[in-house]
Amino acid sequence: MIVLQTIAVAFAMFSAVPVPQFVWDEKNMRYALCAFPLVGLLCGALWCVCGVLPLPAPARAAGFCLVPVWVTGGIHLDGYADTCDALASYGDREKKLEILKDPHCGAFAVIRLCSYFAAYLCLAACVQFTPRVGALWTLALILERALSGLAVAAFPMAKNTGLAHTFASAADRTAVRNVLAVLAVLLCAALLALGGGALAAVAILLFLWYHHVAVQQLGGITGDLAGWFLQKTELWMLAPLCACQWGGLL
């Protein structure tokens, strides 16, 4: 029962998938971050369904672009937009954290979101779906969430409130770190075995950059910054996927 509730907590928080209502407590939140990658598995499965449907190329590209948004309800995009506004302000740490709390959408958020979807749609249109490509992308979507959850359990927090702090405080951080670190290594190995080593390399490099930006700019991570990392990693992994196909490596 606790296992199912733990999975339900992860899907309730990190997706738009309807789940039964129940009280969140210490027991069912302790390992919720370990279940976070399952949302990536669902995104990947639906992405593959979109790939095999007899759709016109533009509709398929739009599906590739929108499936993760529909599954997650845009929660990570919201963090991406807020973080783009904060980082583009070039203010001090307190100013950036204040911008992250502002519910309004600034000009830089709009510009970056438009640029993000333009780039994503363009790359998605270049993807030639095959079972191998579907498997690679599913692994990539799981990996980015494993790394995101690992960061929440391992990186310092920028503040003592908010989504990231709530899940970090409720988690058995040592166990979560160990589980997600092992999962990330296994996913990278699987990507490498399927010819997607470039995707794994991009994810790891962005994970290290994420830590640098979080510590240098904000003093730690926030829920918004976690969303920024996930969206950025997703877009940047799609680029080498396309490049490997163009180069005949997939």
PLM feature spans:
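Membrane-proximal soluble regions of multi-pass membrane proteins
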Residues: 1-24
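N-terminal beta-alpha supersecondary unit
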Residues: 9-12, 26-51, 165-169
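C-terminal ends of transmembrane helices
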Residues: 18-23, 75, 95, 149-159, ...
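Multi-pass membrane catalytic core of lipid/isoprenoid biosynthesis enzymes
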Residues: 29-47, 86-132, 136-137, 175-191, ...
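Membrane-embedded alpha-helical segments that form the functional core of polytopic membrane enzymes
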Residues: 34-84, 135-139, 196-216
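Alpha-helical membrane-inserting segments
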Residues: 46-54, 67, 71, 123-127, ...
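Acidic (Asp/Glu-rich) catalytic motifs at the cytosolic membrane interface
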Residues: 67-105, 212-233
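Solvent-exposed interhelical
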Residues: 146-180, 218-222
